[in-house]
Regions:
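Catalytic histidine-centered segment of alpha/beta-hydrolase-like enzymes
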Residues: 220-231
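Conserved alpha/beta-hydrolase catalytic His-Asp/Glu region
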Residues: 119-174
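Gly/Ala-rich beta-loop-alpha elbow adjacent to hydrolase catalytic centers
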Residues: 69, 73, 77
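Active-site signature of alpha/beta-hydrolase-fold catalytic machinery across serine-
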Residues: 16, 79-83
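Conserved HGGG/HGGXW glycine-rich cap/lid loop of the alpha/beta-hydrolase fold
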Residues: 1-39
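Active-site loop/oxyanion-hole signature of alpha/beta-hydrolase fold enzymes
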Residues: 26-68, 236
């Protein structure tokens, strides 16, 4: 299984799901470009990530894999499936953020530029706990800060990521959606508490028209961090695509 995190995330976020719920499955969860301990060098595009992941699969995977992805990672996953159908057998897409409104993406990018960091770890934790991580177990949130929050030179704190890369990626989310090829089993999970919803009606319609019976849409009662909030449910959906 290949697991792809969302924008501003990192691969280690998948560790609780992999070790506690999918321990019998081999999981690769790399940091995407500009995130975590991956290269921060440009280009910061979906295409560059697809090329890097295809190379990873060519060197490491002995057979086609199920790709599980979250948010921005879903855009990468779908384009990877389209570019390399020989390497991708199925997709599980958790609250996918793809083909979104450009004006909305500009608002989010502007907000990130205006407030990119925090005065303390406590402020960083509160920002997540009062936002899309509100329904995630406190221990998982603590691990996120331990793994991903770093001190900055000016005495503030920020996530282990390249800010220029993040701004570029918000634009990438407004690109036209690249759909997986016919025959790709695809499960989309809509997070019921994400408002406004990232999962657009157009995405659902386009996937249903392209994939027919190979497409499944399900809704989970959680906020945007689906794998962290509902790991058992996500693990069950992944196993369905591995049969």
């Amino acid at each position: 299984m290949l697991a792809l995190h969302g924008l501003t995330g990192h691969g280690k976020r998948w560790e609780p799901l992999a070790t506690q719920h999918l321990s019998e499955i081999a999981v690769a969860a790399p940091d995407l470009i500009g995130h975590g301990r991956s290269s921060w060098a440009a280009p910061w595009t979906i295409d560059a990530n697809v090329a890097a992941l295809a190379e990873l699969l060519d060197h490491q995977a002995t057979s086609p894999v199920v790709v599980v992805a979250h948010s921005f990672g879903c855009a990468v996953a779908m384009q990877l499936a389209a570019a390399r159908p020989d390497r991708v057998t199925a997709l599980v897409l958790l609250d996918p953020a793809v083909g979104l409104d450009g004006a909305w993406m500009r608002e989010i990018a502007d907000a990130m530029l205006a407030s990119p960091d925090y005065s303390s770890p406590e402020e960083a934790r509160a920002a997540k706990a009062n936002g899309s991580w509100a329904d995630v177990d406190a221990a998982v949130l603590d691990a996120e800060l331990d793994d991903h929050l770093i001190p900055l030179p000016a005495g503030r704190y920020g996530w282990r990521l390249s800010l220029p890369a993040m701004i570029s990626y918000w634009s990438e989310l407004a690109r036209e959606t690249v759909l997986p090829p016919n025959g790709t089993g695809t499960t989309v999970v809509r997070a019921a508490r994400t408002s406004p919803s990232y999962v657009t009606d157009r995405l659902v319609t386009d996937l249903r028209e392209r994939l027919g019976p190979d497409f499944r849409l399900t809704t989970l009662e959680c906020d945007h961090m689906v794998a962290e909030a509902k790991p058992a449910d996500v693990a069950a959906l992944i196993r369905e695509r591995m049969r």
